[in-house]
A protein has these predicted regions:
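Membrane-embedded alpha-helical bundles that constitute the cytochrome b-like, heme-associated redox core
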Residues: 1-130
Length: 130
């Protein structure tokens, strides 16, 4: 007669001692919101650039000088770099297990922020230059 097996511990029992899961829900939700926002914004940008296909610089500047395209490009930049920062944060937190984790996270956020600011300022510069 086989020996009785011990019951398999529940998921909650196996997760005890691994820390709180509350902190990650906001980042998880933000990553999903930015991903959903990026879909229509990216499709719009691709369609707009295809429509501008053979246009010269003056036509592009005139297009970006309109309020709606400028706003949508800025929203795309904000969503893209927030999404990038969140995704890289997850990768760093999951795979870097050394003292380099915190400096890497700070560097990642600073770079994403700086590149986003440069993109937004460049968009505004083109949009308001007439």
């Amino acid at each position: 007669m086989p020996e009785p097996r011990e019951p398999t511990p529940s998921i909650a029992a196996r997760a005890r001692g691994l820390g709180s899961a509350r902190r990650g829900t906001g980042a998880w939700r933000a990553e999903r919101v930015t991903a959903v926002a990026l879909v229509p914004l990216t499709l719009w940008l691709v369609a707009s650039l295809v429509a501008l296909g053979g246009a010269d610089r003056a036509a592009f500047v005139a297009w970006l000088g309109r309020p709606l395209p400028a706003l949508l490009v800025i929203l795309l930049l904000l969503a893209a770099f927030r999404h990038t920062a969140l995704g890289l944060q997850v990768v760093i937190e999951d795979y870097v297990h050394s003292a380099a984790k915190i400096p890497l996270l700070i560097t990642t956020y600073l770079l994403c922020f700086a590149i986003c600011v440069v993109g937004v300022l460049a968009t505004l510069s083109v949009a308001f230059r007439r």
